[in-house]
A protein has these predicted regions:
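ABC ATPase NBD coupling module
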Residues: 1-7, 12-15, 19, 37-40, ...
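Q-loop/switch helix immediately C-terminal to the Walker
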Residues: 21-36
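A short, proline-enriched helix->beta-strand linker immediately N-terminal to the Walker B motif
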Residues: 87-92
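Walker B catalytic motif
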Residues: 98-99
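Helix N-cap at the start of a conserved alpha-helix in ABC-type nucleotide-binding domains
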Residues: 105-107
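Helical segment within the ABC ATPase nucleotide-binding domain
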Residues: 109-121
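H-loop/switch region of ABC-family ATPase nucleotide-binding domains
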Residues: 130-131
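Conserved beta-strand-loop-alpha-helix hinge in the C-terminal portion
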Residues: 150-173
């Protein structure tokens, strides 16, 4: 019941989509996640136009490739599609589990730009797990670090003034205090 309101994107681009299915089939299945549907699969022209318009948001040219298998896409394309699919239906929480870790820098930047766009446009709460301190500072509005299973709030009030070096120094200081 609660899962209907949670979208998630995994670290591995292949985990958020079905590689043997087409882009169109993946999108139709994602949209039908809380609906009852039978064995008949069909998409009418109105839905097809909607899927194309959603894919245009990615700016990857996928709107012209609806009938290709997702397994033939690059990692960055698959991750952008997984992000789109995760946010296609109304959700409240978007869980991002290192969703840029397996991508090259250009694809990671694109996926983060899309993530920021979708979170803002759809007014989502996002929980992003990342080791990329640059992304954490640039896109996060609250930083929470974990150290040996303990949660550490990283300067909540001063977050906007942090840079990567400040965050690394804070983490190193915590490590020293704990005895590492």
């Amino acid at each position: 019941q609660r899962a209907r309101f949670i979208g998630r994107v995994f670290q591995d681009p292949s985990k958020g989509t079905c590689p043997e299915l087409t882009i169109l089939e993946n999108m139709a299945m994602a949209e039908a996640k809380d609906k009852h549907f039978g064995l008949t699969f069909g998409v009418n022209r109105k839905r097809l136009d909607f899927y194309k318009s959603q894919l245009e948001l990615l700016k990857l040219g996928l709107e012209d490739k609806l009938h290709i298998q997702v397994g033939s896409l690059s990692g960055g394309q698959r991750q952008a599609l997984a992000l789109l699919i995760a946010t296609m239906t109304p959700i409240d929480l978007l869980v991002l589990d290192e969703h840029t870790a397996a991508l090259d820098p250009k694809s990671a930047d694109n996926v983060m730009r899309l993530t920021d766009q979708f979170v803002k446009e759809k007014h989502l709460t996002a929980l992003m797990v990342t080791h990329n301190l640059k992304f954490a500072i640039e896109y996060g509005n609250r930083l929470i670090m974990m150290h040996k299973g303990n949660i550490i709030d990283a300067a909540y009030e001063k977050k906007d003034a942090l840079d990567v070096d400040d965050l690394l120094n804070q983490f190193n200081q915590i490590s020293i205090e704990v005895g590492n």
